[in-house]
A protein has these predicted regions:
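Metal-dependent de-N-acetylase/amidase catalytic core
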Residues: 1-131
Length: 131
């Protein structure tokens, strides 16, 4: 599961934090616990245990992913939020600068960082991975 980091202390939009918190709440305990939505069991749906959440826009990433092959797809998608973007060229330069700075010490051209959160539910968590 990927969501925004709800605990980010710097500049962050309230709706982004709330979406991140709602995602964490949905993963644990709601998705895994059959008592929260018994009507779904009656409809034939099963509970699901999410074992990992990767939080984006975090201040303390512990997973760094090479996004060199898709950075421009991300930028172009963000530019489509025309009502939210004042200067699309400045946005592009800021993203390229930030992602290249993070990538520099990892041998990538562009990178994105995530904070990995695990939920083992009595099982050993999976090892960290990097793309």
């Amino acid at each position: 599961m990927i969501c925004q980091d709800p605990w980010r202390g710097r500049h962050n939009h309230r709706d982004h934090r709330n979406a991140g918190q709602a995602t964490f709440d949905a993963v644990y305990p709601y998705a895994r616990d059959h008592l929260h939505f018994p009507e779904q069991l009656e409809e034939g749906l099963e509970t699901h245990k999410v074992l990992e959440i990767y939080a984006t826009m975090t201040e303390n990433p512990d997973v760094i992913v090479d996004i060199s092959d898709c950075i421009h797809d991300e930028i172009n998608a963000l530019k489509e939020h025309k009502s939210q973007i004042g200067d699309p060229d400045a946005l592009e330069q800021r993203i390229l600068s930030n992602t290249s700075e993070l990538a520099e010490s990892h041998g990538f051209e562009y990178a994105e960082g995530f904070k990995r959160h695990t939920f083992s539910f009595g099982r050993a968590p999976t090892p960290k991975t990097q793309a």
